[in-house]
Amino acid sequence: MAKRVCIIGCGAIGSLYAAHLARVAEVHAFVRRDDHARALNQHGLRVSGKRDFTASLKATTDARKLPQFDLGIVCTKATQTAEAVAPVAHLFNEGAILSAQNGLGNEEIIAEQTKAYVIRGTTFMSGSRHSDVHVQMELDTATWLGPFEPTKTPYSLVKQAADLIVAGGLKAEALEDARPAQWSKLIFNASVNSVAALTELPHCPLFADQQELSSLGRLLHELIDEGKRVAADLGIQLHEDPWEMNKIGAQTNHPPSMLYDVQHRFPTEVDFLGGAIAREAARANLSAPLHTALYRLIKGKQASWTWGEEES
């Protein structure tokens, strides 16, 4: 079982992994801001909500100060993967790196930069970060892990990583093939995030309401059904039902990451979410008109933030 772990990116999900794993392993957080690192070193990391404890860990912005690791967990936005992993990629040459990120394509980016074994990871766990040293756990659901086939990751290594996460007090399941789980989360995430980004609504009960012709839940259901058809045509049998995932999440009023990005005019992860479904469908000559339309609308929305500046 891994004893030295590096959390790459300490937002809400990264903070949940860092705090829980710090109870059973030596945990280092690699973060972007010096004040974030100082706060974690001085005060530790508090978890509230579904859990209530404070964990001690080490944090830095300087990769030169980090040791070699048995396991890395990448928790950055998909758009930041290459930038975040590059400075520390050499610290896992004898270990493994788990992507616990949204969407498709992160494992490929990680594998390009490191000699480490890469592990596919998908989590439905959610939380809200109240400060650099306080995260609230909202959904305590499993992380699904499996080998990333191009790096020939041994299943035994995946099992060790899952066992470590469980030992820390979180839920995890090692799978021989994690693509069905990854696609379950992808379809759920692409559908919910796209609608949230365009409506600027949090993930609320409206996302599961199908009572009226105008009900937003009808659009969510159609998006999810379309994603299911693409997955089935690609030969992927889903691990979980994305519609059931949506119904559970819609009770939380959780603001999806792309809603936050749109509200702050940050680049979204749409290329790794709805864009990934649209691309995979197009590559296989399959139809995904709804996901493709929302993908284009969000790209257009992002373009609108700078269009006036470019014209002036």
Locate predicted features.
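Short, well-ordered alpha-helices that flank and scaffold nucleotide-derived cofactor binding pockets
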Residues: 19-23, 86-90, 112, 275, ...
